[in-house]
Amino acid sequence: MGRRVDARRVQRQLARDAGAVLFGAMTTATTRGTSPVPPAALDAVAGRLVRARLTRAAPIAPYTTFRIGGPADLLYDADTGDDLAEAIDIAESERVDWFVLGLGANILVGDGGFHGLVIRNRASHVAWHSDGRCIVESGTVMADLIRDAVAAGWSGLEHYVGIPSTVGGAIWQNLHFLSPAPDRQRTMFIAEVFEACRIRRENGERTAVDAAYVGFGYDDTVFHHTRDVVLDVTFRLTPGDPAAMHRILQENLSWRGARHPWLEHHPSAGSIFKKIEGVGAGRLVDQCGLKGFRIGDAQISHIHANIMVNLGRASAADVRALIAHAQAAVFDQFGQRLEPEIGYIGDFNAR
């Protein structure tokens, strides 16, 4: 059993040492849904959305892979790419903050919830073309798209099986995985099968853009630095051998299963800290002896030290304190600053 520590006690301790600098910097990543919204503005947004797909004071933790966080003032299901863009238009016209939610991986929602409009991206239309192109709305679940592509004999997406993401999230993060067994030496990126995408630019314009605009990097694209939103994506796939693709699916699932906690049993946000070139962030946390260390119901995984899991009733405060503890320990022992990879969404000031 992992060591258990009270979250508030750790936060007080960190405020008195060098780790407080790291902990304080972490909160600057929180820029959306942090401040209460006037009820009249929320009413104005709600009145312009499809009522049947709108919920007020809606829990959003169940729609995240961490299963953590308070409610959203407004939760809206967008069924098409155009519907998604229009919902953003409405929120911005009323000066209400908004956030697009896919499968809810790679984020931590504050215990105070999200002040504004959370849009669940349910846009999932897929158009297949005989030349290997497929045009996919951004809310399509990657697992579903991979399954259908393999069944149809189209290769290029099977490498990314087992990573929880929508298509929009895959482009946002430049989804990646190691090349197939036996070598597993090269990192393969979703950018390799990307042809174009249609976006809503942060100025409201709808336009098609290419890879040069997206600026694919390691865990990085233009979407990290703007409020552009992906509406649909065109992938360029190639004919493949179904048997070979199925083998890759199974091998990749087995490889991940042996190295990552399963979300069904241990909710998590995926990797917590960004990659440090030449030195794995998880390796540094592990070398500090922190596997199994817990604060409240948030625990550093026994399987992978760069993953934190929700043991059942973890709060965002628990996770923040655990992140700060790991940052302080690694900085104290190795002089390395761990930078969170996950996004902080909503109000973290709730008591």
Model segments located where?
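Compositionally biased, low-complexity flexible segments
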Residues: M1-R9, R16-A18
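Phosphate/pyrophosphate- and phosphate-bearing ligand-binding catalytic cores of soluble enzymes
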Residues: T28-R32, T55-R56, P62-T64, I107, ...
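Anion-binding (especially nucleotide phosphate/pyrophosphate-binding) glycine-rich loop
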Residues: P38-Q173, F177
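Short polybasic amphipathic segments
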Residues: V126-A127, E195-I199
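Beta-strand segments within the central parallel beta-sheet cores of soluble alpha/beta enzyme folds
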Residues: V161, E195-A196, E341-Y344
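Active-site glycine-rich loop that binds ribose-phosphate moieties when present
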Residues: Q173-C197, A208-D220
